[in-house]
């Protein structure tokens, strides 16, 4: 489903064909709305090594909004612009607003995750709670990857070898601000409109910083040992 291709919505009344091949997910009927619109979050994990497993949750990300207001009514399932928040699918919609100014992270159809969390939080305490839930989701995601053997292909990698990698995953907040995991992005997109390039630029700078800090620390440990 790269780029949102193949996404469709169906009611329970419509049976799934026996020869169907694909992924079926339950629909979250009470998504958290901002200015009446549904959104999803793109979150990131930075992996530095696999043996031992060393991963970091990046405290920022990208939020994408559906172009039309979330107003349940008869026949609304057929209108993907209400439900689908994928920018690639909605890029030609008249309501999509993609800003040229990358410094603006709280306007248009794409936001930064930090201003989004601030917007939906009543106070600092609630903001911290949401970030904690996002972190717990990321931690659970890493454990799921481990349980499903995602890292088994790295068994031939020497211990302590640095293999920097960014993995993205999408999540959604419901009206109770509960986090719902949606999908994994093994090779998340790096460029885009609005604040995407600025945010992803910061992400990769963080990746390089963590990588080189780790290399420097290893070299320092080696020099200290040899001394």
Q: How does the language model describe each region?
A:
Residues 1-166, 174-180, 194-227:
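Catalytic core of tubulin tyrosine ligase-like
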Residues 185-194:
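Glycine-rich phosphate/pyrophosphate-binding beta-alpha loops
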């Amino acid at each position: 489903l790269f780029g949102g291709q193949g996404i469709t919505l169906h009611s329970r009344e419509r049976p799934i064909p026996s020869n169907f091949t694909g992924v079926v997910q339950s629909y979250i009927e009470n998504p958290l709305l901002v200015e009446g619109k549904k959104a999803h979050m793109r979150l990131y994990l930075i992996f530095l090594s696999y043996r031992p497993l060393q991963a970091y949750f990046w405290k920022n990300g990208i939020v994408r909004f559906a172009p039309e207001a979330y107003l349940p009514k008869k026949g609304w399932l057929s209108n993907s612009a209400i439900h689908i928040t994928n920018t690639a699918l909605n890029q030609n919609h008249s309501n999509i607003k993609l800003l040229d100014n990358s410094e603006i992270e709280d306007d248009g159809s794409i936001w930064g995750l930090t201003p989004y969390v601030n917007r939906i939080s009543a106070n600092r305490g609630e903001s911290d709670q949401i970030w904690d839930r996002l972190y717990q989701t990321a931690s659970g995601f890493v454990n799921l990857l481990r349980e499903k053997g995602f890292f088994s292909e790295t068994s031939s990698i020497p211990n302590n070898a640095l293999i920097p990698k960014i993995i993205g995953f999408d999540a959604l907040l419901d009206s109770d601000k509960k986090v719902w995991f949606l999908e994994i992005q093994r090779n998340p997109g790096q460029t885009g409109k609005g604040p995407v390039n600025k945010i992803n630029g910061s992400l990769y700078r963080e990746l390089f910083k963590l990588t080189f800090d780790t290399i420097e620390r290893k070299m320092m440990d080696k020099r200290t040992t040899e001394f």
